[in-house]
């Protein structure tokens, strides 16, 4: 008997009819003699509606206001959990909705972006013993002052991963509106391939680079606690989706632009490779030696993704240093993706999440009025393109190919980041689709 966490996203619970269609999916897992815990998001669009309502009545620039903001936003998941519990009960399946305070899911005091400190599992274990399916409202927690907190956007993914970790689940299944993780956005690349298996680190890079299927925090948690995760479609429940795992079942190499002559050689010539100081040698077919030479550390581009949910913040300040401005930007847990210092310590650029715009507008206006900064501007017409794989940083040819292609396409690159497994380019958002299409074909991603 396995313990499976099933998480259903906003499109999966968008209306009553879709909620009813989740019942057979849950029943199918029970039929395998598995225990099931369910985590749900708010219905699609509901959280945005609640955010709009809050913004209509409040400036949201005080801590006490964000506490009430979290209470309002948490209501979406509560409705979904109760409706799904009712739908299961209608089919004679024992189920009960559970809210964060009932477990509890204890968090810190960072309203709207809370971090979970611990989860008490006694009630969940009791329900499983009684064969009652717990339907947990995702996205929410409760702090030591017994105030509701929320975990930030994508927080229901995080809830599911945390529950899986706390309960030592065998697997965490994330149900969305797509059939898994693809090598590129199928809306841009119609022939993009579904990835059957992907390792944690690759998925973490994908999620943090804009792939919207999973939240990066959820991926980080299942990686930390070594819990397999599957991404599945609610609308194609028989599709196997994508398995995110640490197990050694993932193909080691998926070549992209290796030398054809070396890879296609049909020679059977033997070559000598020294084994040790004694002079003993192995006899290897030349094609295997060439494969080791060109494949084992060859750069591999596995997939490409984009993120348009970004905000460029430019700050002019004579009196504040770069670090002081950066510290100011990160106030209220605003996350920085890129940082850039230009024009002799006078102008500083930061790339953050677009969702932080209102917070930063209030903060920077106050700083400008107090003469801490001279001016600031926002630019929302930016995006990142990220290529993810192996050996990225070590292959100069990769960067040359990318820059040559972008020059040919008249694409302007504002900033660039390189790591061993990822290259990220900051470009204008109008160029995203064209760039993805051309780079996908350039590297023959498959």
Swiss-Prot record:
It is an enzyme of class 2 (transferase). It comes from Rickettsia prowazekii (strain Madrid E). This is Aspartokinase. CDD domains: AAK_AKii-LysC-BS (cd04261). Residues 250-294 form the RPE1 insert domain. NCBIfam families: asp_kinases (TIGR00657), PRK06635.2-2 (NF005158). InterPro entries: AceGlu_kinase-like_sf (IPR036393), ACT-like_dom_sf (IPR045865), ACT_Aspartokinase (IPR054352), AKii-LysC-BS (IPR041740), Asp/Glu/Uridylate_kinase (IPR001048), Asp_kin_monofn (IPR005260), Asp_kinase (IPR001341), Aspartate_kinase_CS (IPR018042). GO terms for cellular component: cytosol.
